[in-house]
C-alpha cells in the first residue's frame, strides 16, 4: 500500500508557485487573491486563515473581507462588482456556506469568470464539460487529479466510482475522470446498493461527509482510494469518509486524512490565482 501524500506534493507546488510569482513581480504583477467571509462560522474562519497563510507562503497577496452576517445581498454583490473591476485582484473567492438570506448561486455567478479561481462559475463549468482547459477547474477535483498524476496512476480504462454528487466535488470529479478516459459511475444518497458499485471499482473517490461510509468489505484487493471527506469526531480527531485502518489493507494507493486531499485543494486555489495573474501578463 502506498500513501498518496498530498501534504508533500502541495509543498512542492507552493515552491514552484513562489518562483512563478517572483517572475511575475519582475514584470510588475503581484498575484492577488481576495477572500470574502460572511459571518462568524468557526470552520469558515479557520479555512480562510489557512488560505491566507498559504498565500503568504508562496508570495501571493491576500485580501480578506470579513463581513457582518447581516449584510444584504446587494451590498455583497456591490463588493464583488468592485473586485471584478479591480485590475490588481486576480482571484475572488466567497467562502461557503453563506447566510440563508443570501442566494449562493447568484453570488457565485456574479464573480467574473476570469477571476473565478474556485471554478464554480457556469462559464468555467461549461469549459470543463466540453473538455477545454480555457477556464478554471474546481480546486478539490483538480487537486485529486494532480495527486493521481504525481504517482503516475493511469486512469485510462479504469472503472471509477465517485460517492457524492455535489457541484463542488462529485460532478466535476466525474467529468475530469471521464475526460481522462475512465469509465465513471456516480453514487449518491439515492443509490440503492452502494457495494454493488464499489466492489467492482479500480478507483473509488469518496466525498459524502459520512464517517466510515466506505468499509473493507465494500472494496476489492488493489483498489485505489481517495478520501475527500473531512469529519471531526467528538474527541476532536479529524477523519475522512473511509475506514482507513481496514480499507488501507486492501488498497494499492490511498489518501490519508488529514494530509491527503485537503492540502491539494488549497494548492490548486493558489495555482489558479497565479494562472489568473499570468493571464493578465499575456
Curated annotation (Swiss-Prot):
Catalyzes the oxidation of 5,10-methylenetetrahydrofolate to 5,10-methenyltetrahydrofolate and then the hydrolysis of 5,10-methenyltetrahydrofolate to 10-formyltetrahydrofolate. One of its GO terms (biological process) is tetrahydrofolate interconversion. Keywords: Amino-acid biosynthesis, Histidine biosynthesis, Hydrolase, Methionine biosynthesis, Multifunctional enzyme, NADP, One-carbon metabolism, Oxidoreductase, Purine biosynthesis. Homodimer. PROSITE patterns: THF_DHG_CYH_1, THF_DHG_CYH_2. The lineage of its organism: Bacteria, Pseudomonadati, Campylobacterota, Epsilonproteobacteria, Campylobacterales. This is Bifunctional protein FolD. Coiled coil: none annotated. Belongs to the tetrahydrofolate dehydrogenase/cyclohydrolase family. The keyword GTP-binding does not apply. One of its GO terms (molecular function) is methenyltetrahydrofolate cyclohydrolase activity. Its EC number is 1.5.1.5, 3.5.4.9. InterPro entries: Aminoacid_DH-like_N_sf (IPR046346), NAD(P)-bd_dom_sf (IPR036291), THF_DH/CycHdrlase (IPR000672), THF_DH/CycHdrlase_cat_dom (IPR020630), THF_DH/CycHdrlase_CS (IPR020867), THF_DH/CycHdrlase_NAD-bd_dom (IPR020631). It catalyses: (6R)-5,10-methylene-5,6,7,8-tetrahydrofolate + NADP(+) = (6R)-5,10-methenyltetrahydrofolate + NADPH; (6R)-5,10-methenyltetrahydrofolate + H2O = (6R)-10-formyltetrahydrofolate + H(+). PANTHER family: C-1-TETRAHYDROFOLATE SYNTHASE, CYTOPLASMIC (PTHR48099:SF5), C-1-TETRAHYDROFOLATE SYNTHASE, CYTOPLASMIC-RELATED (PTHR48099). The keyword Amino-acid biosynthesis applies. NADP(+) binds at residues 164-166, 189, 230. HAMAP family: THF_DHG_CYH. Pathway: One-carbon metabolism; tetrahydrofolate interconversion. GO terms for cellular component: cytosol.
Amino acid at each position: 500500500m502506498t500513501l498518496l501524500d498530498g501534504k508533500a506534493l502541495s509543498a512542492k507546488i507552493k515552491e514552484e508557485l513562489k518562483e512563478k510569482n517572483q517572475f511575475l513581480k519582475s514584470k510588475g504583477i503581484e498575484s492577488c487573491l481576495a477572500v470574502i467571509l460572511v459571518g462568524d462560522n468557526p470552520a469558515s474562519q479557520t479555512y480562510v486563515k489557512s488560505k491566507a497563510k498559504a498565500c503568504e507562503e508562496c508570495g501571493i497577496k491576500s485580501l480578506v473581507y470579513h463581513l457582518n452576517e447581516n449584510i444584504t445581498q446587494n451590498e455583497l454583490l456591490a463588493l464583488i462588482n468592485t473586485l471584478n473591476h479591480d485590475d490588481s485582484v486576480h482571484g475572488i473567492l466567497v467562502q461557503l456556506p453563506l447566510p440563508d438570506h443570501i442566494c449562493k448561486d447568484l453570488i457565485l455567478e456574479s464573480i467574473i469568470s476570469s477571476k473565478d479561481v474556485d471554478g464554480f462559475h457556469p462559464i468555467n463549468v461549461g469549459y470543463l464539460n466540453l473538455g477545454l482547459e480555457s477556464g478554471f477547474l474546481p480546486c478539490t477535483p483538480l487537486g485529486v487529479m494532480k495527486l493521481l498524476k504525481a504517482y503516475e496512476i493511469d486512469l485510462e480504462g479504469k472503472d471509477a466510482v465517485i460517492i457524492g454528487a455535489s457541484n463542488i466535488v462529485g460532478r466535476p470529479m466525474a467529468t475530469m475522470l471521464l475526460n481522462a478516459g475512465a469509465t465513471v459511475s456516480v453514487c449518491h444518497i439515492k443509490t440503492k446498493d452502494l457495494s454493488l458499485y464499489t466492489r467492482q471499482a479500480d478507483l473509488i473517490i469518496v466525498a459524502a461527509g459520512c464517517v466510515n461510509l466506505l468499509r473493507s468489505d465494500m472494496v476489492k484487493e488493489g483498489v485505489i482510494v481517495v478520501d475527500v471527506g473531512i469529519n471531526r469526531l467528538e474527541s476532536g480527531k479529524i477523519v475522512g469518509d473511509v475506514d482507513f485502518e481496514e480499507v488501507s489493507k486492501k488498497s494499492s494507493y490511498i489518501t490519508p486524512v488529514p494530509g491527503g486531499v485537503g492540502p491539494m485543494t488549497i494548492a490548486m486555489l493558489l495555482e489558479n490565482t497565479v494562472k489568473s495573474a499570468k493571464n493578465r501578463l499575456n
